[in-house]
UniProtKB/Swiss-Prot annotation:
PROSITE patterns: DNA_MISMATCH_REPAIR_2 (PS00486), SMR (PS50828). GO terms for biological process: mismatch repair; negative regulation of DNA recombination; rescue of stalled ribosome. Gene3D superfamilies: 3.30.1370.110, P-loop containing nucleotide triphosphate hydrolases. The gene is mutS2. It comes from Streptococcus mutans serotype c (strain ATCC 700610 / UA159). This is Endonuclease MutS2. The lineage of its organism: Bacteria, Bacillati, Bacillota, Bacilli, Lactobacillales.
Length: 776
């Protein structure tokens, strides 16, 4: 895009409005280099980035990362083999810190769905090791003592020397204070000295380093501290040497990472730039327009960014409209409207938010040309008309159907009749070339051209006849009219003179009356539109408030859910720890009897939180139908085992005989079984009983085709069930295969103290593919 348009529309001034929203020098550099784009995808990407930042600010109001310097020159020096000074290292350190902070911020983002910035955040790399090394440089650019053991040692020595020198000189101040010009310790050439009166210079032995301008004071280094000062000088030299070595070491560590650090710096600057664009949009009630492919432009309540308190106007430049012709007297705001269209297009094509309401649309032009204002060339001694015409000729040679052309006062600066004719001819050429054009003119001849010519639309600026001043409201579809007669009347010109003038221009008067009616209709339409927009704004505010409340509620709900999950996890962790303890105790026992298994499983059951069933009306009603009594058959819910009630205690608990074991149970821990249909009832109720089998316990376990871990788990459960059901003997089919499961079964049975004996089945019953187990 040609650079003349940027100067004509003061694009650089617009860019400066974004400066105070930026925090990084890299972001400022990106703003300085910003130019309008002609690639629609790139423009839409810029808008999507701003929309991403808007999402972030909606959830996190404090999104920012502080000031940072441009480190590109420092990185270039590193690549050339140079070492950085402390200030340069401090700038790099800040970039690394900001990278880590921004990466951490991104990793903790919630409730946002980033479309573009996701990939930028993910490209940021962190360098914890380098950050740790650069802690040797503090925020003041000073190398810390802990930067190296040698530096620690040197500075400790310097500190001790300083204390000794100060102590000696303090003693001399006390004892020989009357010989001194001032009672203080001075410094000359890096050495501690005393300001001695010239008349007593021979009373203090030492080295003279300086004499005051008046000659009354001599600065003497007492002999008692000469050696210490020599040591101090050497220590300072050692310190400088060690600091140089440290800077070289730190620079070497950074040298291999310059590309990545440089990319990080660019990413930080770019994100800062996008953040700045969003902040500008928020502060100025700007918006992100949509892009059209047919050169349609619809600007709603558009304002010029460089004006204070600008008047908002609507501008509709439809795809089938070739030109908009703004007519009317000067000082009405025609040029401002022309510039507003131009600068809005430049901002949008630069990926910047525009000062217009949401729902606005802009086109994407390959080039924008403008001839605005008085551009007379003094050096070329050209007249105003010649200057304008030279520029217009250049524009007509370069413009095409992908261009936008803006002409201010086309044809001005020459004879009005000839100027109007030239303006119409130029406009006709642009129309036939299908080039989008907006022009301003005060020539009345062009109004008729705009009315009669297809694809040309008239427009004007509103004038308040009460205050006799322009309102700067844009009236599209209404040509401008002269207000000379009405103004003359209001200013007191004789009615006879005004009436005579109106009679002399009777035709024009009729046209002006038609235009006046159009103006009134346009003003009324705008008033109604303003009312509609007020309602829309109220609805928008309401929708935003509802969305904010929903987000707050959603966040609170998520917080409570996370809290509940953490609490549940604590309960589960505690239960697992206790279950491990119980199982460990079982494994440690030499003998494991059936009642011990039941007791252990009872303890494990208690780890599961109990559900309050006392208020369950269905269960209450069901239990009332039949009360438990001694002799009833039951099924123990915890184990799915059948037993018989033998005794009821006063506290409501029951004693039950389950196999060979007596158990004490609550009523909620068992279900009644009708004695005459116990087996059938057990099957019917099995689906209601926790861990209850759907069929009678089997005396045979088939492990063929199982994985080793799965087989061992099933074997353990099978042996438990067999012991609980008082089985004397069971069969385990493991097959021959690789022998892994068979060996596992053998090892398990050898460890189990309840197994009396075991061995392979007879040849006709499976042989070495099955094992028969007999319990004690």
């Amino acid at each position: 895009m040609n650079t003349k348009i940027l100067k004509a529309l003061e694009f650089d001034k617009v860019k400066k409005q974004f400066t105070h929203f930026l925090q990084s020098e890299q972001g400022q550099m990106e703003l300085n280099d910003l130019l309008p784009m002609t690639n629609q995808e790139k423009i839409e990407r810029s808008f999507a980035e701003i929309a991403d930042v808007a999402q972030i600010f909606q959830e996190y109001a404090s999104f920012g990362f502080g000031h940072s310097q441009d480190i590109s020159e420092s990185l270039r020096r590193l690549e050339l083999g140079a070492d950085l000074n402390t200030q340069e290292l401090l700038a790099v350190k800040r970039i690394l810190q900001m990278s880590a902070e921004l990466k951490d911020f991104y990793d903790n983002l919630e409730n946002v769905d980033l479309q573009i910035l996701d990939c930028l955040f993910e490209k940021i790399e962190t360098f914890p090791d380098l950050q740790g090394s650069l802690q040797a440089i503090n925020d003041g650019g000073f190398i810390e003592d802990f930067a190296s053991p040698e530096l620690t040692k040197i500075r400790h020595h310097i500190h001790q020397n300083e204390q000794q020198i100060r102590q000696i000189l303090q003693e001399m101040l006390k004892k020989q204070g009357d010989l001194l010009a001032e009672n203080l310790i001075a410094s000359r050439s890096g050495r501690s000295v005393l300001p001695v009166k010239n008349t007593y210079r021979h009373r203090i032995a030492g080295v003279i380093h300086d004499i005051s301008a008046s000659g009354n004071t001599v600065y003497i280094e007492p002999r008692a501290v000469v050696n210490l000062n020599e040591e101090m000088t050497q220590a300072r030299a050692d310190e400088r040497h060690e600091m140089t070595r440290i800077l070289h070491d730190l620079s070497d560590r950074l040298r291999s990472q310059t590309d990545i650090i440089g990319n990080n710096a660019w990413l930080l600057g770019h994100i800062d730039f996008v953040r700045g664009k969003y902040l500008y949009m928020r502060e100025n009630q700007a918006s992100l327009p949509s892009l059209t492919t047919d050169q349609t432009i619809r600007l709603l309540s558009v304002r010029h960014p460089l004006l204070s308190n600008p008047i908002a106007n609507d501008l509709h430049f439809e795809h089938d409209t070739t030109a908009i012709l703004i007519t009317g007297p000067n000082t009405g705001g025609k040029t401002i409207m022309l510039k507003t269209l131009g600068i809005t297009q430049l901002m949008a094509q630069s990926g910047l938010p525009i000062l217009a309401d949401e729902g606005s649309k802009v086109a994407v032009f390959k080039d924008i040309f403008a001839d605005i204002g008085d551009e007379q060339s003094i050096e070329q001694s050209l007249s105003t008309f010649s200057s304008h015409m030279t520029h217009i000729v250049e524009i007509l040679q370069k413009a095409n159907k992908d261009s936008l052309v803006l002409f201010d006062e086309l044809g001005a600066g020459t004879d009005p009749q000839e100027g109007a004719a030239l303006a119409m001819s130029i406009l006709e050429h642009l129309r036939l070339s299908d080039i989008k054009t907006m022009i301003t003119t005060h020539y009345p001849e062009l109004k008729a051209y705009g009315i009669e010519t297809e694809f040309i639309e008239n427009a004007s600026m509103e004038f308040d006849m009460v205050t006799l001043s322009p309102t700067y409201h844009f009236m599209q579809g209404v040509p401008g009219r002269s207000n000379a007669f009405e103004i003359a009347r209001r200013l007191g010109l004789s009615e006879i003179i005004v009436a005579e003038a109106e009679n002399l221009t009777n035709t024009d008067s009729d046209v002006n009356k038609i235009i006046e009616r159009l103006e009134n209709q346009t003003i009324e339409s705008r008033r109604r539109l303003d009312n509609i927009r007020e309602v829309e704004q109220e609805n928008l505010k309401f929708n935003r408030a509802v969305k904010k409340l929903y987000n707050e509620f959603s966040h609170a709900q998520d917080k409570e859910l996370r809290k509940a999950k953490l609490k549940a996890q604590e309960i589960v962790d505690k239960a697992l720890a206790e279950s491990d303890f119980i199982l460990k105790n079982l494994q440690d026992k030499a003998q494991l009897k059936p009642h011990e298994i039941i007791e252990a499983k009872g303890k494990l059951k208690k780890l599961v939180p109990e559900i309050e069933l006392s208020k369950n009306k269905v269960l209450k009603k069901a239990k009332k139908k039949r009360a438990a009594k001694v002799g009833d058959d039951i099924i123990v819910s915890s184990y799915g085992q059948r037993g018989t009630l033998t005794k009821r205690f006063k506290d409501g608990r029951w004693e039950a005989q389950v196999g060979l074991i007596k158990m004490t149970l609550q009523e909620s821990e068992f279900d009644l079984v009708k004695s005459d249909k116990a087996q059938a009832s057990q099957k019917r109720q099995a689906h209601l009983v926790k861990r209850t089998s759907q069929k009678a316990p089997s005396a045979r376990l088939d492990l063929r085709g199982k994985r080793y871990e799965e087989a061992m788990q099933e074997l353990d459960e099978f042996i438990d069930q067999a012991l609980l059901n008082n089985m004397a003997q069971v069969d385990i089919i493991h097959g021959i295969g690789t022998g892994v499961i068979r060996d596992g079964v053998t090892k398990y049975l050898r460890r189990n103290k309840q197994v009396k004996e075991f061995g392979y089945a007879p040849q006709n019953a499976g042989g070495s593919g099955a094992t028969i187990v007999t319990f004690k």
